[in-house]
């Protein structure tokens, strides 16, 4: 009889096993981790947390000397949560971590990548965190079923947010990633958001802004000889599964703001593939309601990816080279706009399926074709829920319902 009573109690009151934990830059690791007696170390809070726990970070700047390792998993019904406390501003400054910056041509050990290093971990949720000056901001490897919302990754010494390895069903919502650069590679690989070297279905990037990064805004390329204990040094892999990208804006990427010599940055808004020709496999990416503007190279490019893409109502404006460049993928392009790009609106092979796009008609599209080309309309502070204010930015002046809109609730 007692055994049954214990089971009923555990079923009715599981939360007693998952206490919330509080952390503050002014806390103490000898404290209890309560709101009145917070810990100081985020890592200690992560280590003490159990599935279902919420770790609340009080406002201020945290300056860890080793990165935050997240290597355990919650469950769908009892996820771990790491978040800022009730609207307070939380900055995690990685300037004291290894690789900030690494020397030119130096390698960066897998374990040292990221202010948040998330590996072999599932069912975590992250909210309202700002990650700066780190060896990557967020580095998630072999990590699935995680949720990231209203994260800022800026001025890191590698890619702001990188998802890698066998990773699936991750949602990245309302990411701001900007000013990321890589002195160890002279600009070759620091992107705003990257999904590389692996596979996994169900990954979604939505509502991101990716700007002024040294390489690309978004990069789905893969790197040669990744540093990982389970991968041969002679192996190279791209991300070989579909990624869904929605309501995302990339601008100002690929310019040498750091005086790197020689400069190796690419400067695409959305680079949707690439890598070693002997190892490329098709990935059927879906890109909807995205904008690429004022990037140093192309707006949207397959970069040798052979998948079947679907691009619906996207806009490429004022990029230095080509708006939409697809030669190896077979892309179904519907309702997209290319205007005022430096070299050409498009560069499309005969295999592309194009219908109802700006270049399919007789009209010549230029700045005057839009309600507004005021870039400040998509810059600045977000709304509390992570959206940006809807505006007339790059909307067709004649009211035609093509191209991207900044009304992300539509």
From Swiss-Prot:
Predominant subcellular localization, coarse grouping: secreted
Catalytic activity: Eliminative cleavage of (1->4)-alpha-D-galacturonan to give oligosaccharides with 4-deoxy-alpha-D-galact-4-enuronosyl groups at their non-reducing ends
Xref: SUPFAM superfamilies: Pectin lyase-like (SSF51126)
Region annotation Disordered: where it falls in the sequence: 342-361, 381-410
Signal peptide (residue range): 1-18
Cellular localization per UniProt: Secreted
Bias (Polar residues): 342-351
UniProt protein name: Pectate lyase PEL9
């Amino acid at each position: 009889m007692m055994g049954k009573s214990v089971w009923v109690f555990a079923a009715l009151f599981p939360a007693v096993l998952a206490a919330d934990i509080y952390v503050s830059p002014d806390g103490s690791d000898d404290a209890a981790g309560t709101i009145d007696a917070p810990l100081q170390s985020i890592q200690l809070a992560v280590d003490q947390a159990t599935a279902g726990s919420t770790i609340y970070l009080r406002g201020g700047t945290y300056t860890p000397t080793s990165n935050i390792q997240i290597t355990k998993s919650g469950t769908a019904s009892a996820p771990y949560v790491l978040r800022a406390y009730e609207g307070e501003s939380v900055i995690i400054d990685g300037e004291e971590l290894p690789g900030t910056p690494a020397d030119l041509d130096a390698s960066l050990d897998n374990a040292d990548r990221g202010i948040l290093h998330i590996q072999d971990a599932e069912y975590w949720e992250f909210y309202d965190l700002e990650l700066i000056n780190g060896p990557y901001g967020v580095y998630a490897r072999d990590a699935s079923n995680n949720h990231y919302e209203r994260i800022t990754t800026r001025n890191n010494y590698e890619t702001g947010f990188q998802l890698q390895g066998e990773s699936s069903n991750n949602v990245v919502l309302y990411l701001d990633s900007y000013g990321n650069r890589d002195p160890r590679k002279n600009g070759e690989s620091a992107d705003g958001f990257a999904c590389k070297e692996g596979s996994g279905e169900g990954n979604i990037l939505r509502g991101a802004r990716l700007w002024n990064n040294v390489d690309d805004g978004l990069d789905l390329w893969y790197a040669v000889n990744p540093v990982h204990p389970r991968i041969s040094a002679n192996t190279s892999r791209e991300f070989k599964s579909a990624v869904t990208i929605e309501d995302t804006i990339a601008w100002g990427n690929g310019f040498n703001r750091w005086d790197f010599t020689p400069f190796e940055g690419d400067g695409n808004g959305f680079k949707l593939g690439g890598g070693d020709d002997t190892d490329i496999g098709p990935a059927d990416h879906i890109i909807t309601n995205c904008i690429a503007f004022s990037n140093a190279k192309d707006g949207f490019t397959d970069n040798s990816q052979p998948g079947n893409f679907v691009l619906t109502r996207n806009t490429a404006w004022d990029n230095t080279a080509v708006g939409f460049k697809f030669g190896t993928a077979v892309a179904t392009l519907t309702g997209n706009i290319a205007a005022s790009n430096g070299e050409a609106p498009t560069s499309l092979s005969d295999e592309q399926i194009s219908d109802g796009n700006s270049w399919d008609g007789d009209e010549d599209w230029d700045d005057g074709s839009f309600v507004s080309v005021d870039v400040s309309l998509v810059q600045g502070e977000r709304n509390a829920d992570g959206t940006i204010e809807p505006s007339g930015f790059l909307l067709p002046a004649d009211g035609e319902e093509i191209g991207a809109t900044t009304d992300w609730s539509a």
